[in-house]
Curated annotation (Swiss-Prot):
HAMAP family referenced in this protein's UniProt entry, alphabetically: UPF0270 (MF_00690)
Intrachain disulfide bonds: none
Annotated NCBIfam families: PRK04966.1 (NF003438)
Protein name as catalogued: UPF0270 protein VP2791
InterPro entries for this protein: UPF0270, YehU-like_sf
C-alpha cells in the first residue's frame, strides 16, 4: 500500500528517509555525498512523485521505492 508522504509527520518522514539512506547497499555512486544531501535528494524524489513510501501489510514494514519499480 502506498502511503502519501504528505500524510506523515515531518519528523517521522525525516527519520524514515534517514533510515532508508543509511541502509547497507544504498549506493549513491563514486562521489561521497553528505547524509543531509542524501536525505534532501530522497525528499525531492518523493515531492516530485518519482519515489513512493510503501507499507507492506504482510511484513509490517515501510520502504521507499522508485515509483517506476512499484
Amino acid at each position: 500500500m502506498i502511503i502519501p508522504w504528505q500524510d506523515i509527520a515531518p519528523e517521522t518522514l525525516e527519520n524514515l528517509i534517514r533510515e532508508f539512506v543509511l541502509r547497507e547497499g544504498t549506493d549513491y555512486g563514486a562521489i561521497e555525498i553528505s547524509l543531509q544531501n542524501k536525505i534532501d535528494q530522497v525528499k525531492t524524489q518523493l515531492e516530485k512523485g518519482e519515489a513512493v513510501i510503501v507499507f507492506s501489510e504482510l511484513h509490517e514494514t515501510v520502504d521507499i521505492q522508485l515509483k517506476a519499480k512499484f
